[in-house]
Amino acid sequence: MAADITLLFKASVKTVKTRNKALGLMETTGREEPGAQKRPRPRQRDSFSCKAREVISNISKLKDFLLQHRKDYVNAGSVMSSEVSRMTDSERDQIDQDAQIFMRTCAEAISQLRSEMDKKQVSMQVKDHRAAVLDLIDSYLKGVCKLYSEQRAVRVKRVVDKKRLSRLEPEQINTEKRQSDGEENDKPVSDGNVDLWEENRVEDDLSPEEIQMFEQENQRLVGEMNSLLDEVRQIEGKVVEISRLQEIFSEKVLQQETEIDSIHQLVVGATENVKEGNEDIREAIKNNAGFRVWILFFLVMCSFSLLFLDWYDS
């Protein structure tokens, strides 16, 4: 039975719409309902809250989807569970791909909301409130990412355990076969002669060399089992370490996205300041040139005045 990922698909579509709205790629069309046109001002005024609620709703849908399909998802390759998983490996891989894209899209939507918050001219109290809201949403997304990482780590661990334990199946089959052969050989003949049964029993007794050989084989099997158990424990520790590193990596990626956005804002501000400085320099050069022209004009007029007075006196 195929897993139902309709909720994840709808949540992904809503997240993409939210990101497009934040980027300004979607415009309101004239096909809106009459009831929606009566309140355009509150929507325009409270667009941040609407987008934040939509992002939270999408993250909650992802969390519900992961918890709903957790049992079928983590049963991949489980050899200890007696239940049959209703989810195939391809469906699990598709869930991994969609969940990663979904979480990346949510992180981009949060980053876009942060950039919009920095661009808008609002009071300091409103800006602090929106920053706190975005921090809470970011923490919520990190919690869902941690939940997904833990589920994926459990799935990988069970797949590795199955591959390790599958190597013991041929040896177990041979051991069971030898045990069944031994039981058949040890069954006494109920209707035979007592002397013949005694002779067969003596022939079935193992020699010391055979007993020593079986003991060595048993010791070898025990050693292999212990080594496999140690390898499984090491792999389990490595899987847990990989899960922890993946969680740290996701947190660092989100922090780097926030830092990149802040650096982008600083670069944009520095560019604007450089443009304003160039304009001021041009204006100063223009004013300085005009001042020189007026001084030259004043000197020329003074010279002509002195020449006129000298001519007039003579």
UniProtKB/Swiss-Prot annotation:
TM segment ranges: 289-309
Basic and acidic residues bias locations: 170-189
Segments for region (Disordered): 24-48, 170-196
PROSITE patterns: SYNTAXIN
Topology class, membrane: Single-pass type IV membrane protein
Residues on Cytoplasmic side: 1-288
Primary site of residence: endoplasmic reticulum
Keywords of the record: Coiled coil, Endoplasmic reticulum, ER-Golgi transport, Membrane, Protein transport, Transmembrane, Transmembrane helix, Transport
A biological process from GO: retrograde vesicle-mediated transport, Golgi to endoplasmic reticulum
This protein's GO CC annotations: endoplasmic reticulum; endoplasmic reticulum membrane; SNARE complex
Lumenal side: 310-314
SUPFAM superfamilies documented for this protein: SNARE fusion complex
Domain t-SNARE coiled-coil homology: 222-284
UniProt GO MF annotations: SNAP receptor activity
Domain of life the protein comes from: Eukaryota
Compartments reported by the entry: Endoplasmic reticulum membrane
Classification via InterPro entries: Syntaxin-18_N, Syntaxin/epimorphin_CS
A Pfam family assignment: Syntaxin-18_N
Family per similarity comment: Belongs to the syntaxin family.
Primary role: Syntaxin that may be involved in targeting and fusion of Golgi-derived retrograde transport vesicles with the ER.
UniProt protein name: Syntaxin-18
Originating species: Danio rerio
Lineage: Eukaryota, Metazoa, Chordata, Craniata, Vertebrata
